[in-house]
Amino acid sequence: MRLIMLGTGMAMVTKCYNTCFVLADDAGSFMVDGGGGNGIFRQAEAAGVKIAEIRDFFLTHKHTDHILGMIWVLRMVTERLHAGWVTGEYRFYGHEEVIRLLKSFAEGLFKPALLKQMEENVRFITVEDGETRRIMGRNVTFFDIGSVKAKQFGFTMELEAGGKERLTCCGDEPLKACGQQYAEGARWLLHEAFCEDAQEAFFHAHEYFHSTVKEACETAERLGVKNLVLYHSEDVFLEERKRRYLAEGRQFFSGGLYVPDDLEVIELI
Protein backbone atom coordinates (compact mmCIF):
# COMPACT_ATOMS: atom_id res chain seq x y z
CA MET A 1 0.00 0.00 0.00
CA ARG A 2 1.17 3.51 -0.85
CA LEU A 3 0.46 6.88 0.72
CA ILE A 4 0.37 9.54 -1.99
CA MET A 5 0.54 13.04 -0.52
CA LEU A 6 -1.32 15.30 -2.94
CA GLY A 7 -0.87 18.24 -0.57
CA THR A 8 0.93 18.86 2.71
CA GLY A 9 0.10 22.44 3.65
CA MET A 10 -2.19 24.19 6.10
CA ALA A 11 -5.07 26.42 5.01
CA MET A 12 -3.25 29.58 3.91
CA VAL A 13 -0.27 28.14 2.04
CA THR A 14 0.74 29.48 -1.38
CA LYS A 15 3.90 27.47 -2.13
CA CYS A 16 2.31 24.04 -1.74
CA TYR A 17 -1.21 22.58 -1.78
CA ASN A 18 -3.54 22.03 1.17
CA THR A 19 -3.27 18.69 2.94
CA CYS A 20 -5.00 15.79 1.22
CA PHE A 21 -3.87 12.33 0.21
CA VAL A 22 -4.67 9.01 -1.45
CA LEU A 23 -4.13 5.51 -0.09
CA ALA A 24 -3.65 3.07 -2.95
CA ASP A 25 -2.90 -0.60 -3.56
CA ASP A 26 -3.92 -3.32 -6.01
CA ALA A 27 -7.39 -3.45 -4.41
CA GLY A 28 -8.17 0.19 -5.20
CA SER A 29 -7.75 3.70 -3.84
CA PHE A 30 -9.17 5.83 -1.02
CA MET A 31 -8.97 9.62 -1.21
CA VAL A 32 -9.02 11.74 1.96
CA ASP A 33 -10.02 15.42 1.68
CA GLY A 34 -9.67 17.58 -1.41
CA GLY A 35 -7.82 20.70 -0.41
CA GLY A 36 -9.19 24.14 -1.16
CA GLY A 37 -10.03 24.19 -4.87
CA ASN A 38 -9.60 22.77 -8.34
CA GLY A 39 -5.86 22.69 -7.77
CA ILE A 40 -6.68 19.14 -6.70
CA PHE A 41 -6.77 18.27 -10.41
CA ARG A 42 -3.24 19.60 -10.97
CA GLN A 43 -1.92 17.75 -7.93
CA ALA A 44 -3.58 14.48 -8.91
CA GLU A 45 -2.32 14.71 -12.48
CA ALA A 46 1.23 15.43 -11.31
CA ALA A 47 1.07 12.44 -8.96
CA GLY A 48 -0.27 10.11 -11.63
CA VAL A 49 -3.57 9.73 -9.76
CA LYS A 50 -6.70 9.36 -11.89
CA ILE A 51 -9.47 10.73 -9.70
CA ALA A 52 -12.28 9.18 -11.72
CA GLU A 53 -10.80 5.73 -11.06
CA ILE A 54 -11.08 6.21 -7.29
CA ARG A 55 -14.36 4.89 -5.89
CA ASP A 56 -14.12 5.81 -2.20
CA PHE A 57 -13.66 9.31 -0.78
CA PHE A 58 -13.64 10.62 2.79
CA LEU A 59 -14.13 14.19 3.97
CA THR A 60 -12.84 14.88 7.49
CA HIS A 61 -14.58 18.20 8.15
CA LYS A 62 -16.09 21.33 6.63
CA HIS A 63 -13.20 23.80 6.63
CA THR A 64 -12.59 25.39 3.23
CA ASP A 65 -9.09 23.95 2.78
CA HIS A 66 -10.61 20.46 2.92
CA ILE A 67 -14.13 20.59 1.47
CA LEU A 68 -13.86 22.92 -1.55
CA GLY A 69 -11.54 20.60 -3.45
CA MET A 70 -13.91 17.73 -2.77
CA ILE A 71 -16.72 19.67 -4.46
CA TRP A 72 -14.53 19.77 -7.58
CA VAL A 73 -13.88 16.05 -7.23
CA LEU A 74 -17.62 15.41 -7.08
CA ARG A 75 -18.10 17.56 -10.17
CA MET A 76 -15.42 15.63 -12.07
CA VAL A 77 -16.99 12.31 -11.14
CA THR A 78 -20.46 13.38 -12.25
CA GLU A 79 -19.08 14.93 -15.45
CA ARG A 80 -17.33 11.66 -16.33
CA LEU A 81 -20.48 9.69 -15.58
CA HIS A 82 -22.58 12.02 -17.72
CA ALA A 83 -20.13 11.72 -20.61
CA GLY A 84 -20.23 7.94 -20.38
CA TRP A 85 -16.49 7.72 -19.76
CA VAL A 86 -17.04 5.83 -16.50
CA THR A 87 -19.82 3.74 -15.01
CA GLY A 88 -20.67 2.31 -11.63
CA GLU A 89 -20.89 3.63 -8.09
CA TYR A 90 -18.89 6.28 -6.25
CA ARG A 91 -18.97 6.54 -2.45
CA PHE A 92 -18.40 9.66 -0.34
CA TYR A 93 -18.03 9.13 3.42
CA GLY A 94 -18.24 11.66 6.23
CA HIS A 95 -20.16 12.66 9.33
CA GLU A 96 -23.65 14.10 8.94
CA GLU A 97 -22.62 17.76 8.72
CA VAL A 98 -20.06 17.41 5.93
CA ILE A 99 -22.25 15.06 3.91
CA ARG A 100 -25.12 17.53 4.16
CA LEU A 101 -22.85 20.42 3.10
CA LEU A 102 -21.31 18.52 0.21
CA LYS A 103 -24.74 17.60 -1.15
CA SER A 104 -26.02 21.13 -0.61
CA PHE A 105 -23.12 22.66 -2.57
CA ALA A 106 -23.73 20.26 -5.44
CA GLU A 107 -27.47 20.84 -5.49
CA GLY A 108 -26.95 24.61 -5.57
CA LEU A 109 -24.13 24.70 -8.12
CA PHE A 110 -24.30 21.72 -10.47
CA LYS A 111 -26.36 21.62 -13.65
CA PRO A 112 -29.34 19.21 -13.78
CA ALA A 113 -27.53 16.59 -15.87
CA LEU A 114 -24.82 16.25 -13.22
CA LEU A 115 -27.36 16.13 -10.40
CA LYS A 116 -29.08 13.27 -12.23
CA GLN A 117 -25.80 11.35 -12.30
CA MET A 118 -25.24 12.16 -8.64
CA GLU A 119 -28.64 10.79 -7.72
CA GLU A 120 -28.15 7.61 -9.73
CA ASN A 121 -24.49 6.77 -9.20
CA VAL A 122 -23.15 8.55 -6.10
CA ARG A 123 -23.74 7.26 -2.57
CA PHE A 124 -23.31 9.71 0.29
CA ILE A 125 -22.56 7.59 3.34
CA THR A 126 -22.98 9.19 6.75
CA VAL A 127 -20.73 7.51 9.31
CA GLU A 128 -20.96 7.64 13.09
CA ASP A 129 -18.26 7.74 15.75
CA GLY A 130 -16.76 4.24 16.03
CA GLU A 131 -18.47 2.91 12.89
CA THR A 132 -16.55 0.43 10.74
CA ARG A 133 -16.88 0.13 6.95
CA ARG A 134 -15.15 -2.04 4.36
CA ILE A 135 -13.02 0.07 2.02
CA MET A 136 -10.34 -1.32 -0.29
CA GLY A 137 -11.15 -4.72 1.18
CA ARG A 138 -10.07 -3.54 4.64
CA ASN A 139 -11.85 -2.55 7.82
CA VAL A 140 -11.87 1.22 8.27
CA THR A 141 -13.17 2.62 11.56
CA PHE A 142 -14.15 6.28 11.69
CA PHE A 143 -13.93 8.27 14.92
CA ASP A 144 -14.78 11.73 16.25
CA ILE A 145 -11.52 13.54 17.06
CA GLY A 146 -13.21 15.80 19.62
CA SER A 147 -12.64 19.11 17.84
CA VAL A 148 -14.04 22.26 19.42
CA LYS A 149 -13.73 24.24 16.15
CA ALA A 150 -15.82 22.13 13.79
CA LYS A 151 -16.98 18.54 14.03
CA GLN A 152 -14.23 16.40 12.56
CA PHE A 153 -13.65 12.69 12.06
CA GLY A 154 -10.46 10.74 11.61
CA PHE A 155 -10.12 7.06 10.79
CA THR A 156 -8.04 3.97 11.39
CA MET A 157 -7.49 1.38 8.67
CA GLU A 158 -6.40 -2.22 9.10
CA LEU A 159 -3.23 -2.90 7.14
CA GLU A 160 -3.42 -6.61 7.91
CA ALA A 161 -6.35 -8.89 8.73
CA GLY A 162 -7.14 -8.84 12.44
CA GLY A 163 -6.07 -5.25 12.93
CA LYS A 164 -2.62 -5.99 14.33
CA GLU A 165 -1.11 -3.43 11.97
CA ARG A 166 -3.01 -0.17 11.51
CA LEU A 167 -2.76 3.21 9.88
CA THR A 168 -4.45 6.02 11.80
CA CYS A 169 -5.28 9.51 10.57
CA CYS A 170 -6.39 11.96 13.26
CA GLY A 171 -7.43 14.76 10.91
CA ASP A 172 -5.79 18.17 11.18
CA GLU A 173 -5.82 18.72 14.95
CA PRO A 174 -3.72 17.28 17.79
CA LEU A 175 -4.68 13.76 18.80
CA LYS A 176 -6.90 13.94 21.88
CA ALA A 177 -7.65 11.40 24.58
CA CYS A 178 -10.83 10.28 22.81
CA GLY A 179 -8.80 9.13 19.80
CA GLN A 180 -5.77 7.62 21.48
CA GLN A 181 -7.19 4.09 21.44
CA TYR A 182 -7.03 4.21 17.63
CA ALA A 183 -3.44 5.46 17.50
CA GLU A 184 -1.78 3.52 20.30
CA GLY A 185 0.77 1.11 18.86
CA ALA A 186 -0.19 1.99 15.28
CA ARG A 187 2.23 1.12 12.53
CA TRP A 188 1.53 4.50 10.94
CA LEU A 189 0.14 7.71 12.41
CA LEU A 190 -0.70 10.69 10.21
CA HIS A 191 -0.60 13.78 12.44
CA GLU A 192 -0.60 17.52 11.81
CA ALA A 193 2.41 19.65 12.70
CA PHE A 194 1.82 23.34 12.07
CA CYS A 195 5.38 24.55 12.65
CA GLU A 196 8.56 24.07 14.64
CA ASP A 197 8.26 24.46 18.39
CA ALA A 198 10.40 27.61 18.45
CA GLN A 199 8.11 29.19 15.83
CA GLU A 200 4.83 28.60 17.70
CA ALA A 201 4.51 32.22 18.84
CA PHE A 202 5.02 33.43 15.27
CA PHE A 203 2.55 31.02 13.62
CA HIS A 204 0.09 30.88 16.57
CA ALA A 205 -0.27 27.11 16.25
CA HIS A 206 -2.00 26.72 19.61
CA GLU A 207 -4.43 29.56 18.90
CA TYR A 208 -5.57 27.62 15.83
CA PHE A 209 -5.69 24.32 17.75
CA HIS A 210 -2.62 22.85 16.07
CA SER A 211 0.58 21.17 17.23
CA THR A 212 4.25 21.90 16.84
CA VAL A 213 6.62 19.27 15.47
CA LYS A 214 7.90 18.62 19.00
CA GLU A 215 4.40 18.10 20.39
CA ALA A 216 3.29 15.76 17.61
CA CYS A 217 6.43 13.69 18.03
CA GLU A 218 6.04 13.50 21.81
CA THR A 219 2.49 12.22 21.34
CA ALA A 220 3.59 9.53 18.88
CA GLU A 221 6.46 8.45 21.14
CA ARG A 222 4.19 8.19 24.18
CA LEU A 223 1.69 6.03 22.26
CA GLY A 224 4.31 3.66 20.89
CA VAL A 225 3.67 4.55 17.24
CA LYS A 226 6.09 2.87 14.84
CA ASN A 227 6.05 5.44 12.02
CA LEU A 228 4.89 9.06 12.06
CA VAL A 229 3.96 11.23 9.08
CA LEU A 230 3.74 14.98 9.70
CA TYR A 231 1.55 17.17 7.49
CA HIS A 232 -0.74 20.24 7.46
CA SER A 233 2.24 22.56 7.90
CA GLU A 234 3.31 26.13 7.15
CA ASP A 235 5.14 26.85 3.90
CA VAL A 236 7.19 29.90 4.91
CA PHE A 237 10.26 27.69 5.24
CA LEU A 238 9.17 25.20 2.58
CA GLU A 239 12.59 24.63 1.04
CA GLU A 240 14.06 23.81 4.45
CA ARG A 241 10.91 22.40 6.06
CA LYS A 242 11.75 18.73 5.69
CA ARG A 243 15.28 19.11 7.08
CA ARG A 244 14.25 21.34 9.96
CA TYR A 245 11.22 19.30 10.98
CA LEU A 246 13.20 16.05 10.88
CA ALA A 247 15.96 17.60 12.98
CA GLU A 248 13.48 18.72 15.63
CA GLY A 249 11.30 15.64 15.52
CA ARG A 250 14.10 13.10 15.92
CA GLN A 251 14.86 14.58 19.32
CA PHE A 252 11.44 13.46 20.57
CA PHE A 253 10.42 10.46 18.45
CA SER A 254 12.45 7.28 18.06
CA GLY A 255 10.44 5.62 15.29
CA GLY A 256 10.36 6.24 11.56
CA LEU A 257 9.72 9.93 10.94
CA TYR A 258 8.47 11.32 7.62
CA VAL A 259 7.96 14.93 6.55
CA PRO A 260 6.71 14.59 2.98
CA ASP A 261 6.60 17.25 0.33
CA ASP A 262 3.65 17.56 -2.06
CA LEU A 263 3.43 14.58 -4.45
CA GLU A 264 5.75 12.43 -2.34
CA VAL A 265 4.88 8.73 -2.13
CA ILE A 266 5.51 6.66 1.01
CA GLU A 267 5.43 2.86 0.89
CA LEU A 268 3.40 1.72 3.90
CA ILE A 269 3.53 -2.08 3.63
Question: What spans do the regions from the language model cover?
Answer:
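Divalent metal-coordination and catalytic microenvironments
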Residues: 3, 33, 44, 61, ...
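Active-site metal-binding motif and surrounding structural segment of the metallo-beta-lactamase
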Residues: 38-90
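Cap/insert and terminal regions of metallo-dependent hydrolase folds
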Residues: 174-263
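Active-site neighborhood of phospho(di)ester-bond hydrolases with catalytic His/Asp-centered motifs
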Residues: 32-35, 54-61, 65, 69, ...
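Conserved beta-strand hairpin/beta-sheet module of binuclear metal-dependent hydrolase folds
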Residues: 1-47, 151-172
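Active-site-proximal loop/helix segment associated with metal-binding centers of metalloenzymes
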Residues: 13-15, 126-198
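Metallo-beta-lactamase
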Residues: 86-151, 160, 258, 262
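Short histidine/acidic/glycine/proline-rich micro-motifs that form metal-
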Residues: 11, 92, 98-99, 233-238
